[in-house]
Amino acid sequence: MQTIGFSLSQRENKLRAIRFDYPEYIPMTLYLNKSCWHHYDQNALQDLMESHPFLFPNFKRQKVVRPEYLLNQLKDAPYTDPWKCVWETMDDGITGSVHQHQLGDWSAFEKYEAPDANKTDGTYPIDWNIIRENVKKGKARGEFITGGLPHGHTFLRLQDIRGYEDLIFDMIDEEPRLFKLIEMVEEFNCQYVKNWMELKPDMMKYPEDLGMQVGPMISPELFRKYFTPVY
């Protein structure tokens, strides 16, 4: 697959960018948030996308745009993820946040179980047969194949399960059950990564949010103690 106006394939250009080997252009992916389609004029948005084919190479104009929302992007429809955390959002298309933490009380930990990495990425249900087939087709087309953990795979996952304040107190107090919970999340992530590695992707990614606008969400000392071993 080639980008119009360039000689390198998209895959080769990405590999060169990763290796700092003089790519023809900086690889990027630009999205319009799905909520935009019910907040702004759809024709104006489509005009914008149509005028930038480099940024939106697969754009096809539609009479009416009806986005497909993810399970935690639906207003007035709380979503319980595979870790039993309940997500809510105030606007269709905006990814929600966890409002009910499954282990807001440690008393439920004894019977708490991790989901199956063969059936979910931790946030949504998945079908590895479909993923496997899509990877196969992508490779046949010469595409750059990316695998990896979902966003918020460890620190944010623990925050969703326990709640931010309780998680921080657990780290300060050296709560023994926290170590067991971290191990549970780590084992799930490792199995998920192994499943992806079997498909031999070009790149693996591990996206996570660890900082705020002016600094980290936890001290470097706590990060080194609880998260460096996992990473």
Where are these regions (language model features)?
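Hydrophobic transmembrane alpha-helix bundles
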Residues: 61-72, 94-110, 180-192, 228
